[in-house]
């Protein structure tokens, strides 16, 4: 089977890289199974030389205002034998409506268990965690940053959306490097050019699990800025950060921003780490926490359906309320249970490792075959 994946012209996002990474890494395995996979970024007749044409949502994100580009994209998607639209947007709540026109099949990294949410006329925001912040009057609705809901879309279309795989299969190595930006650049370069991870020891994923009793940081509260371009993100993340700050004194809390080497040192010394939502529900922080064997504290993820599903309540992570109001009680409760936190940390790391392609590519390969059956 020949598959062509269409990317945007001269644009590579971190999310796109992490979504495609398992394909790069497993290319030889997939070739042995009869798959020929090509990446292209130009709209020409070569796109028709395949069994399945896959259009990444970043094509619309970066070229959606270009009428000539979009007309050509529609033409090739109609002429192709079969077209998939691969939505790699951050949140389970956001769709590309033109993706329904382009793809005969619409795949998304994650989706809400409650499909009726999408067509509910009372939603203020497609992202469920944004909607929660607005409806509880924590902030006023900011129409500039909030798209319309999807109540005008047929329920049948929503119900037909399928799940591909999420960015947890990307590359989140946490070894020391002069800067995180440079590290990400090296990882992108080696997967783009070499199509496989470098074999040197320093470039391998590390699944450290330092002696838990020796760790001297109780809680790590270091995450991206309270993005002022989004009031819901700003409120949500600040609520978690403020609760963590209020615990300083009773517990040793590391919060704020650190040079990359210092941050990675803290990852090896921490027992627990907070990872609130951002534009999407899953964040890179989750995966850094899992890799380093830290107990993940995260807003409740039970509303989300995804693959792989790393989030098993009170087994691989510890959920807290979306307004962060119960963080203090949660921490007080779990630290009093002998060995409980360490077990959560080990479970989270082992589950993440079981899906990670550096450890075992077979789960992804099976998923890939399901998606492209």
Q: PLM features: residue spans?
A:
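Nucleotide-sugar donor-binding catalytic core of glycosyltransferases
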Residues: 2-42, 47-50, 55-282, 299-304, ...
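Catalytic binding pocket for nucleotide-activated donors in carbohydrate/polymer assembly enzymes
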Residues: 264-373
């Amino acid at each position: 089977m020949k598959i062509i994946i269409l990317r945007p012209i001269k644009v590579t996002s971190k999310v796109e890289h992490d979504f495609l990474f398992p394909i790069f890494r497993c290319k030889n395995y997939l070739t042995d199974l009869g798959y020929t996979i090509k990446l292209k970024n130009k709209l020409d007749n070569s796109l028709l030389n395949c069994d399945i044409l896959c259009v990444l949502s970043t094509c619309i994100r970066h070229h959606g205002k270009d009428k000539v580009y979009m007309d050509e994209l529609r033409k090739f998607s109609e002429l192709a034998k079969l077209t998939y639209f691969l939505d790699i947007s951050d949140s389970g709540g956001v769709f590309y409506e033109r993706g329904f026109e382009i793809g005969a099949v619409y795949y998304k990294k994650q989706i809400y268990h409650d499909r009726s949410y999408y067509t509910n006329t009372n939603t203020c925001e497609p992202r469920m965690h944004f909607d929660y912040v607005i409806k509880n009057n924590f902030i006023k609705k900011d129409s500039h940053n909030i798209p319309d809901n999807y109540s005008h879309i047929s329920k049948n279309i929503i119900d037909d959306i399928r799940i591909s795989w999420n960015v947890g299969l990307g590359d989140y190595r946490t070894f020391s490097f002069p800067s995180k930006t440079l590290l990400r650049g090296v990882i992108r370069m080696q997967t783009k050019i070499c199509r496989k991870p470098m074999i040197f020891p320093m470039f391998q994923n590390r699944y450290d699990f330092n002696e838990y009793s020796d760790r001297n940081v109780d809680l790590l509260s270091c995450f991206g800025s309270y993005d002022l371009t989004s009031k819901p993100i700003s409120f949500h993340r600040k609520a978690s950060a403020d609760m963590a700050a209020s615990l300083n004194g009773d517990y040793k809390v590391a919060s704020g921003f650190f040079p990359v080497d210092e941050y990675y040192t803290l990852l090896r010394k921490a027992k627990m780490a907070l990872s609130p939502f951002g534009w999407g529900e899953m964040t890179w922080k989750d995966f850094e926490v899992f890799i380093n064997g830290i107990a993940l504290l995260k807003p409740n993820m039970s509303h989300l359906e995804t693959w792989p599903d790393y989030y098993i309540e009170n087994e691989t992570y510890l959920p807290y309320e979306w307004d962060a109001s119960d963080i203090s009680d949660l921490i007080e409760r779990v630290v009093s249970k002998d060995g409980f936190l360490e077990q959560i940390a080990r479970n989270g790391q082992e589950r993440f490792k079981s899906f990670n392609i550096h450890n075992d590519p077979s789960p992804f390969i099976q998923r890939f075959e399901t998606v492209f059956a």
